[in-house]
Each structure stands twice: as structure tokens, then as C-alpha cells.
């Protein structure tokens, strides 16, 4: 299988030359994929190419897509969740989140997830495999084709732990930036935090991308190690203080502030003492806290914190000098919101 999605202009020019074609034929393929964002996903439909060239590419196994739409779910607020099927019959979920001026694509980086966060549906079925860069990028094209508009923002907040698929993650970010023409500053990578991988992310970003301008979002969800271990089992391998130190180094290396995701769970992490503890943990470096309301999933007994507690928590962080905002959930009625994605069509 040779997927052309994610290939650079130079790569595609080389493909053309290998088949005895002029280099500009490679640029025509690139334009077909990225500039036109064409719904025609077969090599033999690239009308700008000579028929015999198209046939040879197809016969030799070249493809523009390895995914197909298995299911569509449109929420009342316009959010679209797609269940995509890969060649190996594994399922991938992605979400298109529209506003008047933006279309945000929430992308998956793995089939399933190994982190087993207790509040998240994705990890309930474990990790099947990591996605190839082409499969990550194809999610953008499917969202664009289904919603008939171009994606403007990217969040890696779908299925999987992005830093456990770091090479394909960064290759896809490079293509999103260079080929899809989406600024790195409009890309967010969310991670539950994996030992040594925050430092590796900044180093490999400079190596593969030449810089590191996307936003790093840490799924912290706790103000101390004890609470974090109860809701995120993998936290036992990565002390919360070490995460913060690695984030401070990340800021020094990249010049970019870090975002911290904080899921408000009633009676677990939503008291004012937790807000004060979180303030002490984060004080003194460039960061921002996103408070997230819990979205109910099956088989989990956590409850959403009250609006009063949420507002008090937000006010306390702000009073303590911590930049904070409340992230609005989208697509709740179709299980397309934060923490609700899973690979099984039976859970729609």
C-alpha cells in the first residue's frame, strides 16, 4: 500500500519522474489532493494526469485514501462526528466542530488508547494500533468533504495518546502546515503526559518541523499526585511535579505557553482547596488552564460538577493570578464531546 496523502511536492515530483513523467505531474497530484480537496479519492480520477500514468499508479498500489465513512452523526449544534473504517476494518472517530468563522477538526492519533483514563470512553477498549500519518490527514479531508468547508483549526484530542505515536504525529503536523496551509499556531496537541516525551516532543519538532509553534495541552485533571493516580492510572509512572518541570523546560525551549486541561469532577477535584493547590503548582511560568465540564459516558459513575462550584473554582484561579477559561463542550447529544469518542459504532 502506497498512500500519496502526506507526501511533499518533492516526493510527488520524484514519483512522477520514476514513471517517466515530467516533474510537474507530481505538482498536479499535490494540487489535486490539497488545493482542490477533491471528493474523488481514486488515483484514476485525477483528470489532469495522462490516463496511462493514472493506470500505472493504480496498478502499482498507489492510493489517495485508505479510509471510508462507516457512520455519520450530526449533533443539534452542528457538530459532526464521523466513524471511519480503515483497510484492516478498525474504526476511527473524528469530529468537525463548526463556528461562524472556524471549522475545528478533532483528530484521532490511534485506534483506541492505552492510557485507560477512568473518565474517558476511548480507553475502555484498549489500544488496537497507532495511525499512520496518511490516516490522520485523511480525517481532515473527510470532515471537509462532509461539511463542505475548509478546516481552519486542528486539535489532537480524539482517540489515542498522540505522544505514543510521535513520528506520525509530527509528519502529519508538517503536512497540515505545509500542504493544508494551516498555521502551527492553530494546531493543539493534547497529551495525558508520558515520561520523557514532553522533552522529546520539543526536540523532534525542531528536527522534523524546523520549529515548534503548535500548542501543547496537558490533560492534568488534578491538583496533586494522589488524585491524579485515582483517575489516570498511568500517572503512577510520572509524578505531577515532574510533569510541571518538564513543561517549564518546554516553555524555555519553544517560547510557547502550555495549556492545562482540567476536567471538573464533582467531589473529586472541584473544591476551592484544589484550586489553591493547582495555583501553587502552576504559578511562575507561561501557562493557561482550560476548565472542562464532565461529559457523561456509560459504565462510569463520575458526576459533572455544579455550575456554582465551577464558577467558584474559576474565580479562585483567576484571583490567584492563573490564566483560566471555561471550554464549552460541543456535540453532547451525539457522544461527540470531550471524552466520549470510542471505536465501536454500537455506542453512538
From Swiss-Prot:
GO MF annotations, alphabetized: 4 iron, 4 sulfur cluster binding; metal ion binding; rRNA (adenine(2503)-C2-)-methyltransferase activity; rRNA binding; tRNA (adenine(37)-C2)-methyltransferase activity; tRNA binding
Cofactor note: Binds 1 [4Fe-4S] cluster. The cluster is coordinated with 3 cysteines and an exchangeable S-adenosyl-L-methionine.
PANTHER family: 23S RRNA METHYLTRANSFERASE (PTHR30544), RADICAL SAM CORE DOMAIN-CONTAINING PROTEIN (PTHR30544:SF5)
Organism (species): Prochlorococcus marinus (strain MIT 9215)
PROSITE patterns: RADICAL_SAM (PS51918)
InterPro entries, alphabetized: Aldolase_TIM, Methyltransferase_A, RlmN_N, RNA_MTrfase_RlmN, rRNA_lsu_MTrfase_RlmN/Cfr, rSAM
Binding site for S-adenosyl-L-methionine: 160-161, 190, 219-221, 295
Entry function: Specifically methylates position 2 of adenine 2503 in 23S rRNA and position 2 of adenine 37 in tRNAs.
UniProt cross-references to CDD domains, sorted A to Z: Radical_SAM
HAMAP family per record: RNA_methyltr_RlmN
Record family assignment: Belongs to the radical SAM superfamily. RlmN family.
Any one cellular-component term (Gene Ontology): cytoplasm
Needed co-factor(s): [4Fe-4S] cluster
Binding-site residues for [4Fe-4S] cluster, renumbered to this chain: 113, 117, 120
Full protein name: Probable dual-specificity RNA methyltransferase RlmN
